[in-house]
Amino acid sequence: MSQEFLDFELPIAELEAKIEALRSVSQQDQQINLDDEITRLQKKSAELTQKTFANLDAWQVSQMARHPNRPYTLDYIEHIFTDFQTLAGDRAFADDQAIVGGLARLEERPVMIIGHQKGRSIKEKVKRNFGMPAPEGYRKALRLMQMAERFKLPIITFIDTPGAYPGVGAEERGQSEAIARNLREMSMLKVPIICTVIGEGGSGGALAIGVGDKINMLQYSTYSVISPEGCASILWKSAEKASTAAEVMGLTASRLHELKLIDSIIEEPLGGAHRNYDTMSNNLKKRLLADLADLDKLDQETLLDRRYKRLMSYGYC
């Protein structure tokens, strides 16, 4: 996968381009030794990357959460779990491709996985509806959760959506009802639920699979009631104020952790999760295993009581 850089990474991109150019020259003419210069530029690039990512603002984090090369749910399933078996359809209308789910093993332990799925190519983006589920997606998710409860399997969800699909058809089929039902039912499921925001956590579309016993966020993910552009359009009548909106919305993992709305921040590799899928997957896997170990210590009554109190505390300081 070719590396893509965001606007604020352009100085890094320029250094990386120089490195690639020198490598190309070195490969074409074996008598030219450019190793020292390449090493010097690599060191400079690493230092600049470290400096850049040490001070990201909320808008830059928002851009990172949407990075086109960022790992999606199916990427984490491939890197973390084994024996994944896809389960499809809501048994009522259709199989929404914006939500994926199924049975898998985490270190030999059977679990149920559910997550939003975006696409990379134009064709796949359309197929996945840009990660925006319709009601049938949330009903599929609920069906899988209820199946997990019957078989006493922990539920692991991965959140990455700009929001629930706002189309006319989705509204006609009961989008708000599907989201509300998931909130209610998830609060009462008698098995452990671990939710992790891996990219965008957009409004009710995220919360519909985000009611859990442990709520985690990747370092450069976001979680908010509306996008920065949407907020700016409402408050300042201009999407150009998105960077200002991002700062005041408190949508970053660090801010939400301060507010005690999430439990853990999962560190990303230098430069973001897309720079190293293996490292990111290992960090996420460690967090999931630790969370499962913690939740295994709780009896069912305590588990449900804690989860319900967490849900009811949202919006209160």
Curated annotation (Swiss-Prot):
Provide the alphabetized UniProt keywords. Answer: ATP-binding, Cytoplasm, Fatty acid biosynthesis, Fatty acid metabolism, Lipid biosynthesis, Lipid metabolism, Nucleotide-binding, Transferase
Query: Which pathway does the record list?
Result: Lipid metabolism; malonyl-CoA biosynthesis; malonyl-CoA from acetyl-CoA: step 1/1
Q: Which PROSITE patterns did the record assign?
A: COA_CT_CTER
Enzyme type, top EC level: transferase
Q: Which Pfam families match?
A: ACCA
Biological process (GO) annotations held by this record are:
fatty acid biosynthetic process; malonyl-CoA biosynthetic process
Q: Which reactions fall under this protein's catalytic activity?
A: N(6)-carboxybiotinyl-L-lysyl-[protein] + acetyl-CoA = N(6)-biotinyl-L-lysyl-[protein] + malonyl-CoA
Localization annotation: Cytoplasm
| Residue ranges occupied by any CoA carboxyltransferase C-terminal domain in the UniProt entry | 33-294
The record's listing under HAMAP family reads:
AcetylCoA_CT_alpha
What is its biological role? Component of the acetyl coenzyme A carboxylase (ACC) complex. First, biotin carboxylase catalyzes the carboxylation of biotin on its carrier protein (BCCP) and then the CO(2) group is transferred by the carboxyltransferase to acetyl-CoA to form malonyl-CoA.
> What does the subunit comment say?
Acetyl-CoA carboxylase is a heterohexamer composed of biotin carboxyl carrier protein (AccB), biotin carboxylase (AccC) and two subunits each of ACCase subunit alpha (AccA) and ACCase subunit beta (AccD).
The identity of this protein, by name, is: Acetyl-coenzyme A carboxylase carboxyl transferase subunit alpha
The species this protein belongs to is Histophilus somni (strain 129Pt)
Record gene name: accA
